[in-house]
Amino acid sequence: EEIGGLALKTDVSVEADIVRLVNEAEKQFGPIDVFCSNAGVADQDEPDGTAASCSNENWLKAWQINVMAHVYAARAVLPGMIARKQGYLLNTVSAAGLLNQIGAASYSTTKHAAIGFAEALAITHGDDGIKVSVVCPQAVATQMLPDFDDGGPQGLDGILAPEDVADSIVAGLAEESFLILPHERVSLYMQRKASDYDRWLNGMRRLRSSFISTPPGK
């Protein structure tokens, strides 16, 4: 209230909640110029550590929050943005959607899907005046980070403060960049993956083995 904002409890996995959020925001403030879709959820490959071991319930939860929440948001705001011939969709995804996250298959898979949807938005609606950006950090100091000091495999290139990620986002929006990479080395990893997929997979296997043989935080 102090900054003139509006806070609404919203379950982003429920489309009706997002529609209500958009309607209430536009009722109070007018048309939405920028919609930031930021919610995410991550689960580890448990209980047995295989890539398919995460429960069906957690797979579906990841799909609803990491993918469908972006779909629901776009569905709610696109008609108005297209009519006005302007608008910006900013989706928080993850470097896991460009590369992979060791030990979190449901997270990596749904983040790849989120990237694909954002690409479809940019391709389909760029000529409608709609801008799209995806934010793809590695480890960020939030409650989603695994419970050990170094952040695990995703903390290999350092753990960023939320404020640092925010600065990257502001710069990326100013440049209207589709891909916003707070950890700059992710771009290099993408190039290596694209240039030799098998070599990249072998490298990821070695990285996984090193973390299995070394206890977290050591």
Residue spans of the language-model regions?
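Residue(s) in the substrate-gating loop at a strand-loop-helix junction
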Residues: 94
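The beta1-alpha1 cofactor-binding region of Rossmann-like NAD(H)/NADP(H)-dependent oxidoreductases
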Residues: 10-21, 56
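Active-site-adjacent segment of SDR/Rossmann-fold oxidoreductases
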Residues: 99, 120-131
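Substrate-binding pocket helix/loop in short-chain dehydrogenase/reductase
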Residues: 46-51, 55-60
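C-terminal tail/cap regions
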Residues: 151-152, 156-218
